[in-house]
Amino acid sequence: SDVYKRQDYDLYKYDRKGVYSERKLKKNPWLMSPHQVYIANDIAYVVARNGDTFKDLGKEFDISWRKLVKYNDLQRDYTLMEGDIIYLKSKKKKASKPYTVYVVKDGDSMHGISQKYGIRLKNLYKMNRKDGEYVPEIGDRLRLR
């Protein structure tokens, strides 16, 4: 019953590591450890890792890097930081049902809140009748829908 050993069927050939050339792995490091995809407000997102770029994420998910910049309300020269939430599709106009009001905590920004709840930044400002100059302060109550 050693008939079922992996080697007997040459299954090792199908291991992911063996499939890619070293050159391809250097150009596409995510092939070895793809990003985990999460969902918020019915939209897929990933959490950036140290050294990630919009171009790398775009390649991994077959999305133009310009779209990723736009979906996430960022500037094209923004440098991704470990822990950044990066949406793979356009965010929504408002948060999902249970989330109606958010109370601002220390360190919050409008962009951070918009990323956390998957809401377009301009809609978060509009819903709360705030302009681009507004900086949230601890205790402020912001509508999410």
Please place each PLM-identified region on the residue numbering:
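Short beta-strands and strand-coil junctions in structured, solvent-facing domains, enriched
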Residues: 12, 54-56, 75-77, 110-112, ...
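Short, small-residue-biased leader/transition segments that mark boundaries at the very start
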Residues: 1-4
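Primarily a LysM-type cell-wall glycan-binding module
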Residues: 30-62, 92-126, 137-141
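N-terminal post-signal-peptidase region of extra-cytosolic proteins
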Residues: 66-75, 97, 125-131
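Long, low-complexity, acidic/serine-threonine-proline-glutamine-glycine-rich intrinsically disordered tracts
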Residues: 12-39, 66-70, 78, 91-95
